[in-house]
């Protein structure tokens, strides 16, 4: 696919701000995407059709689109149903990312069936699997996802608190050694340039960074926390 050729190697910046965050604005996210492009990003990950629409007006970079939507406190909230797929496809997005964990989806549809339905309805749409474990990655590769992302590693009940860098990047090593047909994208807790660099040194070609670049509240807190540790 053409999009896979366009997004071969480099940094993807996740430009997202939730409703309770001060930068929550499609206009602001479009400018954040522009800043990311000016800094050398080769792609953008964005949440919601409003943000995506504005970002497309500002930059010509490939976009990984998602819709975060909660259904009855279901754990799966990243592009969880066909409704969100339809919205993203109607807007037009290069890659759609969705929760590809083994957790129950809000509509009760199994991931394998969901993937098949998407491919039947939108056969040319590139899809990214957001996974949290090696078994989920193996399953996503078997299904035929174009991309596999480590997005949810550390964010599910079974992986809560884990970091991609734990045990000298052991989880990432296992993924790389699996030699997937799908393109691997490292995402989640890549909070320093050195972590990103390490991923590339290991052979990864695509890394997504979000909060470390685009969430000034959290960035400020880290500075304040370190400053406050100094006793005088």
Curated annotation (Swiss-Prot):
Catalytic activity: an N-acyl-D-glucosamine 6-phosphate = an N-acyl-D-mannosamine 6-phosphate
GO biological-process terms attached to the record: carbohydrate metabolic process; N-acetylmannosamine catabolic process; N-acetylneuraminate catabolic process
Keyword Isomerase set for record: yes
SUPFAM superfamilies (alphabetical): Ribulose-phoshate binding barrel (SSF51366)
UniProt keywords, alphabetically: Carbohydrate metabolism, Isomerase
Pathway where it operates: Amino-sugar metabolism; N-acetylneuraminate degradation; D-fructose 6-phosphate from N-acetylneuraminate: step 3/5
E.C. number(s) listed in UniProt: 5.1.3.9
The keyword Isomerase is assigned to this record: yes
Gene Ontology MF term list: N-acylglucosamine-6-phosphate 2-epimerase activity
Stored InterPro entries: Aldolase_TIM, NanE, RibuloseP-bd_barrel
Source organism, top-level taxon: Bacteria
CDD domains, alphabetized: NanE
GO CC list: cytosol
Biological role stated in the UniProt entry: Converts N-acetylmannosamine-6-phosphate (ManNAc-6-P) to N-acetylglucosamine-6-phosphate (GlcNAc-6-P).
Family of this protein: Belongs to the NanE family.
Protein name (database record): Putative N-acetylmannosamine-6-phosphate 2-epimerase
Source organism of the structure: Borrelia garinii subsp. bavariensis (strain ATCC BAA-2496 / DSM 23469 / PBi) (Borreliella bavariensis)
Gene that encodes it: nanE
């Amino acid at each position: 696919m053409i999009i896979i050729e366009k997004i071969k190697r480099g940094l993807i910046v996740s430009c997202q701000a939730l409703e309770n965050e001060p930068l929550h604005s499609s206009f602001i996210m479009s400018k954040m995407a522009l800043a990311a492009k000016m800094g050398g990003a080769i792609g953008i990950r964005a949440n919601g059709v409003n943000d995506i629409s504005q970002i497309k007006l500002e930059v010509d970079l490939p976009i990984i689109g998602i819709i975060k939507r909660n259904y009855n406190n279901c754990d799966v909230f990243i592009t969880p149903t066909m409704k969100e797929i339809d919205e993203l496809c109607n807007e037009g997005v290069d890659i759609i990312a969705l929760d590809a964990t083994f957790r129950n989806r809000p509509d009760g549809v199994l991931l394998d069936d969901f993937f098949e339905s998407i491919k039947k309805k939108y056969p040319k749409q590139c899809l990214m699997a957001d996974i949290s474990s090696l078994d989920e990655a193996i399953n996503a590769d078997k299904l035929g996802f174009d991309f596999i992302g480590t997005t949810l590693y550390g964010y599910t009940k079974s992986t809560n608190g884990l970091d991609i860098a734990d045990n000298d990047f052991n989880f990432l090593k296992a993924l790389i050694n699996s030699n997937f047909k799908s393109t691997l994208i490292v995402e989640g807790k890549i909070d320093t340039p050195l972590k990103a660099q390490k991923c590339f040194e290991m052979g990864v070609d695509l890394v997504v960074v979000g909060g470390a670049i685009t969430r000034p509240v959290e960035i400020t807190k880290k500075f304040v926390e370190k400053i406050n540790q100094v006793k005088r």
